[in-house]
């Protein structure tokens, strides 16, 4: 509704790419939120990071690149709840869904870079999100029915769509146009660290030594990966 992209004049291969990007985007979110129904948020986020870190490892060509990936992985593990992976309370289906979301995240990074280069501006993302919405709408209607059409639900859904999808995915698409996939994968490790800092500043949540060390590790990894990419 905010942007009216030009959707004609592109080769069929580019349109198929954008639709595939949208399908992966929808599957990633469905798998992740389904995992949240079964396992704690911290565990789900940690497991999902196998995706971007896997892309970073696959794209690494030097030992220094692997060092940044290892630092980011260590930081993410430090941010996971203590004992989260040692208990008997983890639902295997939830773990599997979180790992599946990570695989879709890896595909999202690769397809996002290709889509960003195949279309100008946000055109590719808009086509992808429309395709993703069309694919997920039947799932939502089957689970919630007419309740989805209530004014309160529509308003909340619009806010979530804007803040958790339209704005961040637009920014990520611009980043994917400019960065190698491996560097983007490492930079994604900043997300849980930034969340911890926001919790400290906005919500007054206390940061223990594990969280502080994790923030330092992922920040150093992000800076190191970015500088290495710029040097190349």
Region spans (language model):
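Membrane-interface interhelical linkers
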Residues: 1-20, 61-67, 85-90, 116-119, ...
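Hydrophobic alpha-helical transmembrane segments
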Residues: 15-20, 46, 66-70, 96-99, ...
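Hydrophobic alpha-helical transmembrane segments of multi-pass membrane transport proteins
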Residues: 19-34, 77-78, 96-111, 138-183, ...
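Hydrophobic transmembrane alpha-helices of multi-pass small-molecule transport proteins
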Residues: 23, 50, 64-83, 130, ...
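Glycine/small-residue-rich loop that forms an oxyanion/phosphate-binding "nest" at active or ligand-binding sites
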Residues: 29-33, 37, 42, 48-49, ...
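Hydrophobic/aromatic residues within transmembrane alpha-helices
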Residues: 35, 40, 59-62, 115, ...
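Alpha-helical transmembrane segments of compact multi-pass small-molecule transporters, enriched
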Residues: 47-58, 131-135, 183, 187-202, ...
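Transmembrane alpha-helical segments that form core, pore/gating elements
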Residues: 55-56, 74, 86-143, 157
């Amino acid at each position: 509704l905010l942007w009216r992209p030009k959707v004609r004049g592109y080769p069929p291969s580019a349109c198929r790419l954008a639709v595939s990007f949208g399908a992966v985007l929808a599957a990633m979110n469905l798998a992740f939120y389904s995992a949240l129904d079964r396992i704690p948020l911290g565990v789900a986020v940690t497991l999902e990071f196998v995706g971007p870190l896997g892309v970073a490892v696959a794209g690494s060509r030097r030992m220094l690149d692997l060092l940044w990936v290892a630092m980011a992985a260590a930081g993410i593990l430090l941010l996971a709840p203590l004992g989260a992976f040692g208990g008997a309370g983890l639902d295997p289906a939830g773990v599997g869904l979180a790992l599946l979301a990570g695989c879709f995240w890896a595909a999202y990074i690769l397809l996002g870079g290709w889509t960003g280069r195949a279309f100008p501006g946000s055109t590719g993302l808009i086509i992808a999100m429309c395709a993703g919405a069309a694919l997920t709408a039947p799932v939502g209607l089957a689970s919630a029915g007419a309740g989805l059409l209530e004014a309160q639900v529509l308003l909340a859904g619009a806010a979530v769509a804007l803040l958790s999808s339209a704005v961040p995915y637009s920014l990520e698409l611009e980043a994917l146009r400019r960065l190698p996939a491996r560097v983007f994968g490492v930079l994604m490790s900043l997300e849980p660290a930034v969340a911890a800092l926001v919790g400290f500043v906005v919500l007054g949540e206390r940061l223990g030594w594990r969280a502080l060390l994790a923030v330092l590790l992922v920040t150093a990894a992000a800076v190191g990966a970015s500088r290495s990419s710029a040097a190349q």
